[in-house]
Swiss-Prot record:
Keywords: Cytoplasm, Hydrolase, RNA-binding, tRNA-binding
Keyword Iron-sulfur: no
Localization: Cytoplasm
Record's protein name: Peptidyl-tRNA hydrolase
Taxon lineage: Bacteria, Pseudomonadati, Pseudomonadota, Alphaproteobacteria, Rhodobacterales
């Protein structure tokens, strides 16, 4: 059994915040993989399902971020799990938006949700770090993570959520490499080799050294047909006038 924990703050006010990206990830997994309806348990919203034959509990603590460990500790003890069975999805300031990294154990890096989990179950649990970027100064962090993702971020955010869901089964079986591949295929899909080769060929044709372009020949105007040559105007002078004109 695995316990997937998504970090965030409860309530509609916070639903679209950067700090709630962990909740968003679990919502996507639950929706895509037919998990049970969410119910209240362990001071959290909980859903159950199966991924690649592995039973998985999804947990969204409703204690607010700074007390997330209370909920995680309760669930861990109830299901008789170890910290190694836990994977926490959380926002990561030190990763650029759309980036994702898997980590096992280590410090909390000042993240209050992780700090609380450390206090209740120790540090030996897995994390899926979801990049949201950094505002540039530590004094701006609180306001930054408690603001909604802007509309401009919705494209990569949707791709990231789908990638996390695609790879969830691999994560449940401990295959972090396959999980990361699934995420990468959504966030940075491979380009068409045919399209790239075609572009390359066109570029080469445009700039191939040593090949002089032959200028196009100017079109030679066609000679008019015999019937098209205008006839000389008729001479209307009298014979006497013609004779006089010769001596002018």
């Amino acid at each position: 059994m695995k316990l997937f924990v998504g970090l965030g703050n409860p309530g509609a006010k916070y639903a679209g915040n950067r700090h709630n990206i962990g909740f968003m990830a679990l919502d996507q997994i639950a929706s895509d993989h037919g998990f049970s309806p969410w119910k209240s348990k362990f001071q959290a919203q909980m859903s159950e399902g199966t991924l690649s034959g592995e039973k998985v509990i999804l947990l969204k603590p409703q204690t607010f971020m700074n007390n997330s460990g209370q909920s995680v500790g309760e669930a861990l003890r109830f299901f008789k799990l170890t910290p190694a069975d836990v994977v926490v999805f959380h926002d990561e300031l030190d990763l650029a938006p759309s980036k994702c990294r898997v980590k096992n154990g280590g410090g909390h890096a000042g993240h209050n949700g992780l700090r609380s989990i450390h206090a209740h179950i120790g540090a030996d649990y897995g994390r899926v770090r979801l990049g949201v970027g950094h505002p540039g100064h530590k004094d701006a962090v609180a306001g930054y993570v408690l603001r909604d993702f802007p509309k401009a971020d919705q494209g990569w955010l949707d791709d990231l959520m789908r990638g996390l869901s695609d790879g969830a089964a691999a994560l449940a079986t401990g295959d972090s490499g396959r999980f990361m591949n699934a995420v990468a295929l959504r966030v940075a899909p491979p380009r068409s080799s045919t399209g790239e080769a075609s572009k390359g060929r066109k570029k080469a044709q445009k700039s191939e050294p040593g090949v002089a372009k032959t200028p196009a020949k100017a079109a030679t105007p066609e000679a008019p047909a015999a019937g098209d040559i205008p006839a000389a105007p008729e001479d209307s002078r009298s014979p006497m006038q013609k004779l006089l004109d010769k001596f002018k």
